[in-house]
């Protein structure tokens, strides 16, 4: 009886030690993320307080700065102006609700107070945004994000915006046409790298919807190609999120309106992002 009891205890201790080792190993793999800062840029799928971005930040105990705005798209409009309001002024249409303005808001947080952000000097400003555009980071600021994740593209597809030619990815970012998807991605990734070179930039593709779209997969492929050419991790949420057109067309299981994720859908997205970040930072060890 004593031998059996000894075996049970020993087996239990082995199990406990194994679990502890696995837990410590998992934490070690991503120790460079824990307690750090993460920035989310995107549209209405990312903007909610309990979105995949919040779920991801909570998992790693990271501080989240969410700059996403409902309705945003990658590509500029013909009349887009520099507009750093948290909710860009629409002037009747969504001309300023674009990723470039979210990136400018990010740059203001990372650039020292009073320093001019020269790229904006070439552009027109909305009357509500003072020119020149300058940094807002004070000497006491601790803002120093480890990761910026940009999740966008579904509104570009719905609005019929041009993907453009892949050659836009090879241009100096100042010459990239932000009215095309490729040009907008090149500009955003490149300018963030210029001002925050130690920050990892991750791209997310759109997820599937309940309604069929022939164009959306083309935008997904373009974002993946952009990630590859710009040496920027890109996560294929369209294929990996577990949210599918086939299921959502019959029942709103993960998308409450056929487009926007409910709590379960956001959880699925968060889990995919977490997995990829673990893989990304494990490979860096």
Sequence positions of predicted segments:
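Conserved SGNH/GDSL esterase-like catalytic core that processes O-acyl groups on lipids
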Residues: 34-40, 45-166, 170
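Bacterial lipoprotein signal-peptidase II cleavage site
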Residues: 22-28
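Second-shell loop/turn segments in exported
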Residues: 41, 45-46, 171-178, 210-213, ...
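Extracytoplasmic/secreted proteins, especially bacterial periplasmic and envelope-associated proteins
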Residues: 40, 51, 55, 59, ...
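Bacterial N-terminal signal peptides that target proteins for export
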Residues: 1-9
């Amino acid at each position: 009886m004593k031998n059996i009891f000894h075996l049970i205890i020993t087996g239990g201790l082995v199990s406990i030690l194994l679990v502890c080792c696995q837990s410590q190993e998992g934490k070690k793999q991503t120790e460079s993320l824990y307690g750090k800062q993460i920035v989310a840029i995107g549209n209405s799928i990312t903007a909610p307080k309990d979105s995949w971005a919040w779920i991801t930040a909570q998992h790693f105990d990271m501080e989240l700065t969410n700059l996403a705005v409902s309705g945003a798209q990658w590509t500029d409009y013909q009349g887009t102006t520099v507009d750093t309001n948290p909710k860009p002024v629409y002037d009747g249409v969504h001309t300023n609700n674009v990723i470039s303005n979210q990136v400018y808001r990010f740059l203001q947080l990372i650039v020292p107070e009073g320093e001019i952000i020269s790229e904006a000097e070439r552009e027109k400003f909305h009357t509500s945004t003072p020119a020149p555009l300058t940094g807002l980071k004070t000497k006491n600021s601790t803002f120093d994000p480890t990761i910026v994740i940009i999740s966008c593209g579904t509104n570009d597809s719905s609005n019929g915006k041009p993907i453009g030619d892949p050659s836009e990815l090879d241009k100096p970012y100042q010459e990239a046409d932000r009215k095309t998807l490729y040009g907008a991605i090149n500009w955003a990734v490149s300018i963030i790298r210029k001002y925050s070179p130690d920050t990892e930039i991750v791209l997310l593709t759109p997820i599937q919807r309940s309604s069929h779209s022939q164009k959306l997969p083309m935008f997904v492929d373009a974002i993946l190609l952009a990630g590859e050419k710009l040496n920027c991790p890109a996560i294929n949420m369209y294929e990996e999120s577990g949210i599918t057109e086939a299921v959502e067309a019959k029942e709103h299981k993960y998308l409450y309106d056929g487009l926007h994720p409910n709590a379960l859908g956001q959880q699925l997205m968060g889990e995919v992002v977490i997995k990829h970040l673990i893989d990304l930072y494990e490979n860096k060890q």
